[in-house]
Amino acid sequence: MLYWLTSISDGGDAFNLFRYITFRAGGAFFTALIFGFIFGRPLINLLRKRQRFGQPIREDGPESHLETKQGTPTMGGLLILSALTLATLLWARWDNGYVWLVLFVTVSFGLIGFMDDFQKVTKNSHAGVSGRVRLAMGFGIAGIAGAGALLLHPEPLAGQLALPVFKDTLINLSILFIPFCMIVIAGSANAVNLTDGLDGLAIMPVMIAAGTLGVIAYAVGRVDFTSYLDVHYVPGTGEIFVFTSALIGGGLGFLWYNAPPAAVFMGDTGSLALGGALGAIAVATKHEIVLVVVGGIFVVEALSVIIQVAYFKKTGKRVFLMAPIHHHFEKKGWQESQIVIRFWIISLILALIGLATLKVR
């Protein structure tokens, strides 16, 4: 919204700063961060008042969770979503289709998560919205986003899958492009949701991945950068950098209260929204495969559940002591803080590898 102040600028005054994506990204970051700091505690108090028992804790999970996490309120993702949405609307250009695409996916998946969290805390049970209904809604939203991306992408990128590292390599997905987008976005949302099981475990890798994808979005949205890096130019995606900066600011504001011992959990409201956002950004920037690298922690968490369920159905035995895999490490005797920080370190390493794909050709 503030971008429109440039219309009254003569090019030499302070309003001219709003032309620059980097300036507005910084503004979005600090707006979301300050919002989180100011409204975090009041929101937690409200959630604690409204949620009699807090987030239901799995009885078959690690025993320590029943002692340390019982009664902690959930739906803290509302803080991230509110900060993120406000900052994005305030600092991003409203005439940019990619911003609206990513924001649509984020808020829509947040609503699915809110419905799920609401049923859980109301019933004091893990039985929220049924898995099939949740997946159906998620795939529906992702399908709309895929169609939107198809309309926004310029030729010859529309409907194509870009391969990282390989120069000028595109795979024409044709009618499979929208189903592919559905898998990427819905898969990302649910993978982050599975990762959100320990204090601070999901939010930091999400912020690292968002920051990485934000840099990629900024780079592929500039013709000079894409010419130098020899990557595909996707005009308009640079504005996504404002969104990812707001996400990081809101995420840090949330982490202030989610740091161990957590005063609030993000819940499905936050994890589905943030995961969906990562998937949507990857689709918008034509870096879906890079998301698999940058979001490697989420991929491993999701695969651990898939492998565990499939193997147990076939043999009646388990591959892991417990899935998702972070619970396996808990059962092995790792401290919660060890798991969280080590996963953060791995996320940072994967982010650097993901950024390297911009240059390696």
From Swiss-Prot:
Q: Where in the cell is it found?
A: Cell inner membrane
Entry keyword annotation includes Lipid biosynthesis? no
Q: What is its EC number?
A: 2.7.8.13
Record's keyword terms, sorted: Cell cycle, Cell division, Cell inner membrane, Cell membrane, Cell shape, Cell wall biogenesis/degradation, Magnesium, Membrane, Metal-binding, Peptidoglycan synthesis, Transferase, Transmembrane, Transmembrane helix
Q: Which InterPro entries match?
A: Glycosyl_transferase_4, PNAcMuramoyl-5peptid_Trfase, PNAcMuramoyl-5peptid_Trfase_CS
- How does the record say this protein sits in the membrane? Multi-pass membrane protein
Give TM regions. Answer: 27-47, 72-92, 98-118, 135-155, 169-189, 200-220, 240-260, 263-283, 289-309, 338-358
Q: Which reaction does it catalyse?
A: UDP-N-acetyl-alpha-D-muramoyl-L-alanyl-gamma-D-glutamyl-meso-2,6-diaminopimeloyl-D-alanyl-D-alanine + di-trans,octa-cis-undecaprenyl phosphate = di-trans,octa-cis-undecaprenyl diphospho-N-acetyl-alpha-D-muramoyl-L-alanyl-D-glutamyl-meso-2,6-diaminopimeloyl-D-alanyl-D-alanine + UMP
- Name what cofactor the protein needs: Mg(2+)
Report the PROSITE patterns cross-referenced here: MRAY_1, MRAY_2
One Pfam match, given by its short name, reads: MraY_sig1
Which GO molecular-function terms appear in the entry?
metal ion binding; phospho-N-acetylmuramoyl-pentapeptide-transferase activity; UDP-N-acetylmuramoyl-L-alanyl-D-glutamyl-meso-2,6-diaminopimelyl-D-alanyl-D-alanine:undecaprenyl-phosphate transferase activity
Please give an example of a GO cellular component term from this record: plasma membrane
What's its top-level EC category? transferase
Q: Which GO terms describe its biological process?
A: cell division; cell wall organization; peptidoglycan biosynthetic process; regulation of cell shape
Q: In which pathway does it act?
A: Cell wall biogenesis; peptidoglycan biosynthesis
Q: Which domain of life is it from?
A: Bacteria
Q: What does this protein do, in the record's words?
A: Catalyzes the initial step of the lipid cycle reactions in the biosynthesis of the cell wall peptidoglycan: transfers peptidoglycan precursor phospho-MurNAc-pentapeptide from UDP-MurNAc-pentapeptide onto the lipid carrier undecaprenyl phosphate, yielding undecaprenyl-pyrophosphoryl-MurNAc-pentapeptide, known as lipid I.
Question: Member of which family?
Answer: Belongs to the glycosyltransferase 4 family. MraY subfamily.
Q: What is this protein called?
A: Phospho-N-acetylmuramoyl-pentapeptide-transferase
What is the scientific name of the source organism? Dinoroseobacter shibae (strain DSM 16493 / NCIMB 14021 / DFL 12)
